[in-house]
Amino acid sequence: YPFGIPVHEVAAALLSGNGVILKVATQCQPVGDLIRRMIREAGFPPALFHLVHLGGSKAGTAFLDGGIDKLFFTGSTETGRILMQEAGKRLIPVSLELGGKDAMIVLSDAPLERAAAGAVWAGVSNCGQSCGGVERIYVERPAYETFLSLLRQEVRQIRQGPDSFDVDIGSLTTEEQRKKITQQVQEALSLGARLIESSPVETHAKPAQTPDLQGESRVQEGYPLFYPVQIIEVDTDTGSLMQEETFGPILAVSVVESEEEAIRRANDSSYGLTASVWSLSKDRASRVASRLQAGVVTINDHLMSHGMPETPWGGFKQSGIGRTHGDLLIEELTQVKVVVWERLPRMKRNIFWQPIDSAVYEGLKGALSLIAGKGIVPRLQGARRLFRLLARKVRFF
């Protein structure tokens, strides 16, 4: 993500005729250097692309005060809101790709084995650090127990550890993120949620503290940022685990009594980036998808459309402003200009220019009658009035 998200916007901006100033996340400086090297080796003029190294708190103001024409930002909703306010003071347009609290709806006729595997793929890939990943799962009651059993099996099989082809996911990126996830889980457990599964973490470094299946703090044998995959069973959508972005390997699962309840609860969020519907009925899946308040909805899949460059990417509500990818990204990177040519430039003046009198009014009204009059007589009368006006007003050099 630190490479893929900026590089497609940078490439599109350059191909659209823009110059680019790029600042990457503080934790990802080598990625910026790689993009700069790619641009240089592609043969673009050096002045078209600049990489800057600034702290996040300084970068926004520096960019906005530096005379840019548009600001693109990917990050938290809180930071995006601040940048939009500051850009608004300067009337600088913005495109914001922000957070998500993405919902997965599993209907009673869903392919449950695929749904369980898909929930783990979309919920914990990159250790759950995907803005478009699954964070909330709503399952219709007839499918709930079977789905939950399959989901637990999938989580038990997750292999987590350092870089290797023999592991499925790695670690979190920052200690700050680990603390946030831990706080959300502990708050949910205090509100009555149940931790029903936690994946094994087999690494060889210093220990860390994470909640165990009883909600108590336990020592995790592994590097502190290797947070286990956890399934949390919840009954209500209160609390930060269900309302705020988690950005970690936590799957919050809840049973619903109907597709109507699933839609209502999925939409009961300040975010609206992505969502998914799982069902073997095209009619049901389409009906539910059409009512979800999300910029991207996938059917029987999740966390995959970002890799389709032709499809627009962006969210509803507090998940962002604008769209990236595809034709809409090009529109975000260009200004609309209208150029109108007069077809009769040798005419001395248009018939509706001054001086104006009643004959002009009647002649123009006759044009309307000629075009839209009801019946042949009103149209012929309109044509007569129009031709009288043209004969009097039209003069060429």
Language model features with spans:
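Rossmann-like NAD(P) dinucleotide-binding subdomain of oxidoreductase/dehydrogenase enzymes
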Residues: Y1-R114, D166, V256, L380-A383
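A generic structural signal for well-ordered alpha-helical segments
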Residues: A13, A87, L151, A188, ...
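ALDH superfamily catalytic-core signature
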Residues: G43, K70, E78-T236, I299
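Conserved residues at the C-terminal ends of beta-strands
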Residues: V52-G55, T74, A122, S279, ...
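Short glycine-enriched loop/turn motifs at secondary-structure junctions
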Residues: D65, L98-G99, C131-G132, D166, ...
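Conserved C-terminal structural/oligomerization subdomain of aldehyde/semialdehyde dehydrogenase
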Residues: I105, P207-G222, F226-F397
